[in-house]
Each structure stands twice: as C-alpha cells, then as structure tokens.
Amino acid sequence: MKKNELVAIACLLCFCCCNETEKEVPNPDLQEELSPIQFTIDLQKEVLPFPVTKSIPELNIPEPIPQNPDAEEDPSTPDIDPDNLYNRIDYIVYQSGKPDILVKHKQFTPQDPDFTIIYDSLPSGDYHICFLAHSDKNISVSGQTALFSKVSDTFHLFLTQEVQTGERIIKDITLQRIVGKIEFISADAVSKALKSFTINVSNYQNKIDLTTGNGISQNTPYTQTDTFNDSDIGKTNFSHSFFTFIPAPEFMLKAHLSAKNQINEVTREREVNDILPLINHIIRYTGILYTPKESDDTFTLDILNDGKWDSPIDKDLKD
C-alpha cells in the first residue's frame, strides 16, 4: 500500500559529535569500551491507490479497501517533498530492564552537521532505542512517553538492540508514520465578509507511548484558527487540517467548526462527531464551511492514504 517510510542504516563507524540538544545519564563505568554506531535516516515510498465509495450513512468510517492495482493514480496528488516532512530527530536510548532506564536523549535539527545522520557510541549491553522524526520544537519526554505541544507529521521506531564489545553492527531499520491527518475542505467560496475559520477538537491526541507509537488519551482540547486575507476572496477548496496521533477506538475525536465574519459573528457552525483517525491516512471532509445555512446539505467524507496522501474514499453525511 502507499507508505512513507523512513529508512535508517546502522553501521559501525568512528564516533563523531553533533551540536544537538542532548540529555545523557553518565555511565559509571568509564573504563568500559564503547562501540561507535552511525544511523543514517532516509525516505522511501510505496504506492497503493484507493477506490471511491459513496453513500455511507452518518459518520461511520470503514477500513479502506485496496483498489485494483491497474487503476490510474490521481494525477492531482503531488509528490512528497522529504525536506518538509520533519525538521527534528529525537534519539532516545534506554538500558533494557524492569523498568527500562533512560540512558540518553538527543535531538538533532537541520542546523547540526550531517542532519539525518546520528553518531553515537554505547557500552556492551541490551538496549531499547526509540527514533522520532517530527517538527515539534517543544517535545517533552518522560519515562517512555512523549508529549507534543502540537502534533506534526511524525515517524517512529522502537527497537531492541544488543551491543557487544568490539561487535560490528550493520542493520537496516524502518520508521513508520504514526499520525493521521484530519482535513476540512470548503465547497463554498471565501467572501469579502469572512474573517476566520476555527476548529475546536475534543480528545486531541498529542501524547504517545514511545514503545508502541500509539496515542494516549487524556481529554486534551485543541483549537486552531485560520485567518483569511484579501487574496483569498472568491477562492474555494480551502484546506483546514491538523495532525493527530491514533487513539484507541473508544476515544474518538469530535470537531466543532465555526466561521466568523469581520465583526466576529458566527456565520456557519458544524459539528463532526465520532472521528476515528487512521494511521498514515487523511480523513478528508468536503462541504459548506463558511456560508450561512439556508437548507439541508451533505458533508462528503474522503479518506486518503499515506505518503503522497493519495486517492479519496467519499462518504455522504447528513447535517
């Protein structure tokens, strides 16, 4: 299927230091030999288009069904730009145990030499290592959980690694996308009177279990407001979107949508319930977002898959 994957090749090389953000617990045995390791992060893609499915009642979102592999791909879907997927790499090392003990936490940015290449050295032992690629400047790691100030496109891997003194380690590892994207597309045009569009989300998923990459529900609210300018007047198909980690099925999201005019009067409100994000997919809603309601209309739900955020699954919803 369509996937964006981050591929890291770990091999034995000379140890180099980067000017990254680093938290490290000193090793009490300073005489123990260290084994230098290098992780190089890259991007890979696979493609699987999805069919159009219509007239699904209410907001019941089914699992996507793979399309005939001979079907044509949506030509409007742009290629992925790897430079825009992430600008932070977190490298978190735990000494394996019951419980695991945090050994070090390093964060790399594009300002570091050889960004996407992680140099490290570890003494012999058993380790759990977590990799996160994302764009949040304010990530907070506590134990084996991570809290994000705002969820961005995020890729993850948690692996078990044995390190032996003098051992040569060459290993391919793959980071998987662990977020879904919720997107609202306007079917109506931006009017001169329109000022802003706000999304209020209940049960926003901005915390994860680092061992699995799964979202941890904690009833967090999230608000996002997009403001229009003069160049937007008359345009349609505006996208308003946010990323989220994947909750357990019993913790679905709810979104309240509201458009306001220049004097801060609400011109349109919509409530979207029971949103269950899908990992590596866009859940796309298309409908009237700004214009005052005059009659009943429908809200079309699209689901797009992964890296290139590909072809939609359409669903009709009643107000």
Segments from the language model and where they lie:
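Sec-dependent signal peptide recognition
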Residues: K2-I9
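C-terminal motif of bacterial Sec signal peptides marking the signal peptidase cleavage site
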Residues: C14-C17
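Acidic/polar, low-complexity intrinsically disordered N-terminal segments immediately downstream
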Residues: T21-P110, F115-I117, D126, H281-D319
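Intrinsic-disorder/low-complexity, polar/charged segments enriched in Ser/Thr/Lys/Arg/Asp/Glu/Gln
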Residues: P36-Q38, D114-T116, R168-I170, K181, ...
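Beta-strand secondary-structure signal
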Residues: P36-T40, D90, H128-C130, I170-D172, ...
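Tryptophan-paired
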Residues: A71-S140, K195-H281, S311-D319
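Extracellular beta-sheet/turn segments enriched in Thr/Pro/Gly and aliphatic residues
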Residues: S149-I178, I185-A187, R270-D319
